[in-house]
Each structure stands twice: as structure tokens, then as C-alpha cells.
Amino acid sequence: MENGAVQQLQLLGKRVKGFGVGGRYVAHPYYSGRFRELLGCTPFPGTLNFDANLDWRELASMCEPQVIPGTVWDGVRLGAVYVWKAKIMTRHGYVDCAVIRPLLSGHPPTVLEIVACEKLEPILENNPDKTVIVTIACKRGDALRWRRY
């Protein structure tokens, strides 16, 4: 692989319920500006959570993330977030998104979150098993790897 070449990592996971707080963080000025730069839009104030059956640390070792560093904002600690530019399969084709892992997350290490320009739930395939297909753009790693739930 050429130095700096973009490779793809495809994850196949299952949607899971979140804690209901993702929207508050995505809409926070500290994070929303970073997501706006990455996605080219104001992100929908919420996340779609999925169990990738892959520990986020393993993902980070295969595909180097961008990092939004932690900070203190008006006396409140905001944790660092790992971010991967990606696309999610919807009934309309692939949609640009960001796969994220907040480092202060209370989710199991295999649960990742997706941030996008629009609410994803209505445009995902109506499949009873709640499958999610995400393709992450990597700057290093193998050409294509599959992780199945």
C-alpha cells in the first residue's frame, strides 16, 4: 500500500439502545464544530449506537482515528472522542457519517456511535435484525476486513 493511501474497513453490527444523551454532546459547541468540519454540515443532534462486535481499541489499532481532545468548558469536563470518517448503508445508498467512540463512554467497548447530517433511523433499512453496515476510511491497515455480528 502506498504511504497515505486510503483503505476501507467494513463493519457489520447491530443497532443497540443508547443512554439518550448523545444529542446533548453532539449539539455542544465544542463537539459540533468539529463534526461540522468533518461532515460539511451541522450534525443531527443525536447518535445511532451499534454493537460492532469489535473493541474500539482494536478498531483504533487497525484504523487510526482522528482525536477530539478532552477539555473543560465552563467548568464541565468534556472527554476526548475518537472519530473515524465513514459511510453508512441506508435504503437510499451510502450516507456520509462519523463513527465515534467517546473515551468516557459507559457503553461496552464494542459499542460505537454514529453521527450524521440527518437522523438515520428513518432511512435505515427496515430489517428485523437491526443490522448496520458501516465503511470506515482508513489511512493504514489491510485493504478490506469484515467483522460480522
From Swiss-Prot:
A GO term for molecular function: riboflavin kinase activity
SS bond partners: none
Cofactor entry: Mg(2+)
Pathway participation: Cofactor biosynthesis; FMN biosynthesis; FMN from riboflavin (CTP route): step 1/1
Cofactor note: Binds 1 Mg(2+) ion per subunit.
SUPFAM superfamilies: Riboflavin kinase-like (SSF82114)
Superkingdom classification of source: Archaea
A Pfam family per the record: CTP-dep_RFKase
Residues bound to Mg(2+): T47, N49
Keywords: Flavoprotein, FMN, Kinase, Magnesium, Metal-binding, Nucleotide-binding, Transferase
The keyword DNA damage appears for this protein: no
Binding, CDP: G18, F19, G20, V21, G22, G23, E118, K119, L120, E121
Residues that, per the record, bind FMN: S105, E113
Coiled coil: none
GO biological-process terms attached to the record: FMN biosynthetic process; riboflavin biosynthetic process
Recorded catalytic activity of this chain's protein: riboflavin + CTP = CDP + FMN + H(+)
Family note: Belongs to the archaeal riboflavin kinase family.
Annotated function: Catalyzes the CTP-dependent phosphorylation of riboflavin (vitamin B2) to form flavin mononucleotide (FMN).
Protein name (database record): Riboflavin kinase
Source organism of the structure: Hyperthermus butylicus (strain DSM 5456 / JCM 9403 / PLM1-5)
